[in-house]
Structures are given as structure tokens and as C-alpha cells.
């Protein structure tokens, strides 16, 4: 039984995608590969497991040296993703003036003084300028001179030439870099405008996913992918435990929106633990049952079940001033101690005598929050090896 979370967070642009559901006992999300740049999440690659086969789905096609790719692997089927935290934001120009004001255009009242500090980065088309500054003073004239350009070497060169004065300028700030500059010049009675960089009209003013964090059933969280800027959101379905598929919208260079399909977790399959003891003897295997009720003792309570088996495999050495026992000299190894622990008590089948010393290996067969539902092992003249089947305890 699966359920779609009705809200997909982010914008409405991009191509719609829905990976469907992978909710079988052994199915689920195996690996997430997230591509990010200085804006946020640019693509999402998901590896699902369905009936033992790996199914790969990709959303967003942007690739390049400016993109960082990171993997988050889930230990499917024992581990699964339970929720997603993230942020979504709008991508548009912001114009700043001295004094901290932010608006679309600057006028002469702002003294043409712009100081946009941005971290060094590598946009898709050219190197970013770490600091762009324009300063003028009213009523001051000076000789014209040409200063060398500062910044990166990529991109298309431009030179507006010389004019009488600068009447207005606009600076576009996109995420952590200056993305465009627009100059309004005056020469005589003419007014000339030059714009360089990415025009604000080219920007996607719709929302997009800027960061993602995944949490699993083992209380493990992925690193934070992208830049946590914008409105926070969380994808989680009450009454449903496991994310079994993703859906949303994607464009060429970003994930615009993200939603998820959830399902109720199916009880994990029975797990076979490795047998402990010796290698001699004929193998036996009782198979799988709902519960183990009798070995050499009986579980008297309906709600009693075996939780672990403890034992010792090796030899009992002769007591001081005594001859070696026939069993000790004949066998290379055997079970010298065995006890069964239940949720109520402990049943000791074979114990160590304080009169003897023992050599060999002690062991304990146990899986947290599981009960023993079957046995297997090896026997010859004696019990040489014992192993168990376990399954999760209901309401553990």
C-alpha cells in the first residue's frame, strides 16, 4: 500500500516526472546521486531496486566542472529513507546600494556607489567577480582614463567607450555572484544604455530546490546537498514509513520541484545467522517456523520466545591429578556449554563444571529486537554446530 504526498515543494516550471513506486519486500531506494552548483540542486539521479534489478532514473541534465556530484547510499532493504528536509527559493536579480537597501534599480540619489561582496565561484558562462564597485561624486570632473579589467578571463569582452557621465546603473546579483550590469550613460543630449551579462528576463522567476537532506530508518542523515537558502520544507507522510519513489519537476539545469511516494514498511524477511561451532558432522536444517517452542525444554507461556543462544565449543580438559576423559581425548571439539535465553528466563542445557578447565570459543547467537524461530547446524556423535533463524519481534 503506497501513498503520494500531495504537495511537491518548489516551482511549477520544468518537466513533470514520477518514478512510480518500489514497495516490494526487497525493493526500495538504493542510492541517491545529487548534482549541485552554487545555486542549489541541478540534477538528481536515483538508483532503485525492483525484484533484484537496479533501475536508474535521472532528472535534470546539467553537467560540467562547476557541478559537484555527491552520493548517498542506503543499505537496502534493511535501511530505507523516511523523510526529506530541504529548501526552495526563487531565482531573480537583486540590486543593492550602500546603506543596505535592496531594490530593482539605482538612481543618482544613491551616489552610484555599489559594493557587492560575493564569494568566489565559477558560474556556467564566466568567472564571477568577487567585488564590483562603482563610485562617483556629484559636481566633480576629471580626465578620462582606462583602468585594466579585474576578474576572470572567461566570457565575451565588452567596452562601452567614454561618455560625459553615468546617470544610472543597475547591478544584478544572482545567488553568490554578480550576474549582470546595466549602465545608463549621457553624452550631450543623448542617453545610451548598455547591458552586459545575464538579463533578469532570462532568469527563472519560478521556484527551484536549493538544498536537500535525507533521513533514513537507521536514524542516519545524509550531508546537506546544495545551499540552504529560501523556504524550508519537509517531505514526510504520517502513518507511512518508507519513501518508495520520487516525483516532481525538472528542467535542463535544475530540479524545480520535488515530491515523494510513501508506503507502509513490509515486515523484513527472516534472517539466517551464521552457525557457530565445529565443521565436522552432517548438516541439518529445521527450516523456518513461526516460533521455536521446544528443544530440550518447553516454553510454557504463550508470549515467551527465545531471544538468544549462548554456548561454548571446544574441549573439557582433565582435572588436576586425573586422567583425561574418553570424550576429551577422542573428540577434537564439541559443545561444552549451551543455554537458551528467552524474554522471561534462561534455560541451561549444559553447563561448565568448576572442577574442570575448558579451552575453545564462547559464542552468543542474538539479533537485537528479534526472536529465534528456527535452528540448523551440524551433528555427528554429538552436536558440533548450531545456528538459528531470527525474525523481528512485533512491537519491539
UniProtKB/Swiss-Prot annotation:
Cited Pfam families: Jacalin
InterPro entries: Jacalin-like_lectin_dom, Jacalin-like_lectin_dom_sf
Domain of life according to the entry: Eukaryota
Keywords: Lectin, Repeat
Record Gene3D superfamilies: Jacalin-like lectin domain
Single Gene Ontology MF annotation: carbohydrate binding
Boundaries of every Jacalin-type lectin domain copy: 3-138, 144-264, 270-392
PANTHER family: JACALIN-RELATED LECTIN 3 (PTHR47293), JACALIN-RELATED LECTIN 45 (PTHR47293:SF13)
Family as reported in the entry's similarity comment: Belongs to the jacalin lectin family.
Protein name: Jacalin-related lectin 45
Organism: Arabidopsis thaliana
Taxonomy of the source species: Eukaryota, Viridiplantae, Streptophyta, Embryophyta, Tracheophyta
Recorded name of the encoding gene: JAL45
